[in-house]
């Protein structure tokens, strides 16, 4: 019996195309190449201070001094292509050694530079997760100080365990089946995946599931390894920078590699941020003229129902899950509703705002909401009838639709069918106005 692939195509091809459109739109919104370039510049300024602070811990704690050489070798053999790792390691060690002779004011400047770079990283990740509320400065500094302080220690401990396992199994790798040697060789990728996952979980000021963070970290680690090998092959086979820059060739090559590294890191962050959306299917939402008005009515209906149950509020993530809408799209609609004094933000829970309905549903009509979300000029410019009705007031003069004078209470009394009916009746007004304008033309 042959399998009919037409059914499979009917279910998967449209979804894959929608997912492709969503991925391209999300990548454009996040501006990953531009953000990676900005982070490259700040990384160059703060790389020496961060390494100075991190490696100073091994001097302060004698029990960890043996880790430093192992960590340096691990970092520059797994994070930097071998063609440029040796001169870069020499320069950074020299710079870090020179930094130890700075005065107190100079050391404060180095620490400030390091913190500013870390804050830039946090801002970039918050933008990818669409987080609008930042942590207090003290908490942000403590989080990054913990990452810089304990990160090398954890890496050193992991390297010690890995070295012990490799030494124990050295005599058995050739005899054991199922590619145990390959498994041992995957330890650096696993460590990189864990490091990426920790970055994605702890840095953004929002709740990130460990499974999403680790899966994205694993993708980033594999992409990082592929990029490292490809970059090393390119530098070895096409020594363009060496021919042009001579002895200074390591600097532009290192800058380019930092840029590629940040690009991979941000790509992994985008994957971690979009996995919940893809898993729930929110990326398949289709936008149409009046869709924001319809979705805003759905949000108001949920908040209206929440009034009867404690705590009488709903979080942005909860609203998005119930309506199957993206978190950033829900946040934008809530801000629009807040400007109309229809809803209010009451509290903040680690990046997730909680909202409540503030307006009187018995007296508030649909007209202000419709004028805000449908008749505003920036939104009209994206609709099909914008070229016929360029002036918002011309369109408004055509709209004598009694459905817009209906109160929210009357709409919500019928539940979801009432919302659909109100949106459908209100959506008839633009079509009527378009026909009238075409008749006059």
Swiss-Prot record:
Statement: the UniProt record of this protein carries the keyword DNA damage: no
Transmembrane segments: 44-64, 101-121, 141-161, 182-202, 207-227, 248-268
Location in the cell: Cell inner membrane
Superkingdom per UniProt: Bacteria
Topology relative to the membrane: Multi-pass membrane protein
GO CC annotation, single: plasma membrane
Pfam family, one: Virul_fac_BrkB
Alphabetical keyword list: Cell inner membrane, Cell membrane, Membrane, Transmembrane, Transmembrane helix
Matches recorded under HAMAP family: UPF0761
Protein family: Belongs to the UPF0761 family.
PANTHER family: INNER MEMBRANE PROTEIN YHJD, UPF0761 MEMBRANE PROTEIN YIHY
Annotated protein name in UniProt: UPF0761 membrane protein RSc1559
Taxonomic source organism: Ralstonia nicotianae (strain ATCC BAA-1114 / GMI1000) (Ralstonia solanacearum)
